[in-house]
Design a protein with these regions (language model features):
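Active-site-flanking alpha-helical
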Residues: 179, 183-184
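Metzincin-family zinc-dependent endopeptidase catalytic domain
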Residues: 55, 59, 63-173, 185
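C-terminal motif of bacterial Sec signal peptides marking the signal peptidase cleavage site
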Residues: 16-18
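Fold-level signature of zinc-dependent metallopeptidase catalytic domains
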Residues: 40-57
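Sec-dependent N-terminal signal peptides
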Residues: 6-11
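Positively charged n-region of N-terminal signal peptides that target proteins for export
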Residues: 1-4
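Metalloprotease/metallohydrolase-associated module, dominated by Zn2+-dependent proteases
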Residues: 143-169, 185-233
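Bacterial signal peptide processing site
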Residues: 20-22
Length: 233
């Protein structure tokens, strides 16, 4: 656990120092693809196909996610990013999660299932992938349709394609929820291109890419705090 958090902190600090919301670099030049001498234990992200979300679709998302994380963490060797994302076994959404009046699945119930599957092993952040409509109670509304939800911080997220106008934006929702799981809140600035902006029920991921300077700073502080905490345990 300590090594994994140090690894996450390391790649986050590199990202915050080296990436910008504008011109993106493939990075990796001159660093090679060799793994660290003491590689992290476990994986950072497990992509979990749910229901009719196919393994092939999950693999396609993984490829895109690895590519985009390569842009974001542009100082990190490609092999590190490759090793941090994998596709897990397919799983069905429990029938108990279904809210029949709106034919939606409670996202909180899905998170509980994903969390319990690994017995609370926080070395793996599991992201459930579904085509079904998912919901939670938020913004003063009961059973509000959403694109994603995660524990913040925590070891489980769920994302849905149901409300996405462009399926190509799924990687953005995935990164948004993953960063929530690391403890990063919604963006508080008027920065429409920031991936951490709250959608507020609107599908605006098509215009989002990267993090604003405030969110970079917040993520740096979160990861530095976690690194210090586990160095002292």
């Amino acid at each position: 656990m300590k090594k994994l958090l140090l690894f996450i902190a390391g790649i986050s600090i590199l990202f915050l120092a080296g990436c910008s919301n504008g011109n993106q670099s493939h990075g990796n030049e001159g660093m090679g693809d060799s793994l660290p001498a003491d590689p992290p234990l476990g994986y950072v992200i497990e992509l979990k196909p749910l229901g009719n979300f196919s393994h092939q679709e999950a693999e396609q998302l993984r490829e895109e996610l690895v590519k985009q994380l390569g842009f974001i963490f542009n100082k990190v060797p490609k092999a590190w990013v490759e090793a941090s994302v994998f596709v897990g076994d397919k799983k069905e959404i429990p029938a108990s999660c279904l809210y029949k009046p709106r034919n939606r699945y409670w996202a909180g119930g899905i998170l509980k299932m994903l969390h319990e599957e690994h017995g609370g092993n926080d070395e793996i952040v599991t992201i459930g992938l579904t085509h079904r409509d998912i919901s939670t109670s938020i913004h003063g509304q009961y059973n509000y349709g959403i694109m994603g939800l995660s524990f913040r911080p925590g070891d489980a997220c769920v994302v849905s394609t149901f409300r996405l106008k462009r399926k190509d934006d799924l990687w953005k929702v995935t990164i948004h929820e993953f960063l929530h799981s690391r403890g990063l809140p919604h963006c508080k600035k008027d920065a429409p291109k920031c991936l951490m902006q709250d959608a507020h029920g609107k599908n605006t991921f098509y215009m989002k890419h990267g993090l604003c300077e405030d969110c970079k700073s917040s993520l740096r502080m979160i990861m530095t705090h976690q690194e210090t905490k586990y160095q002292n345990t």
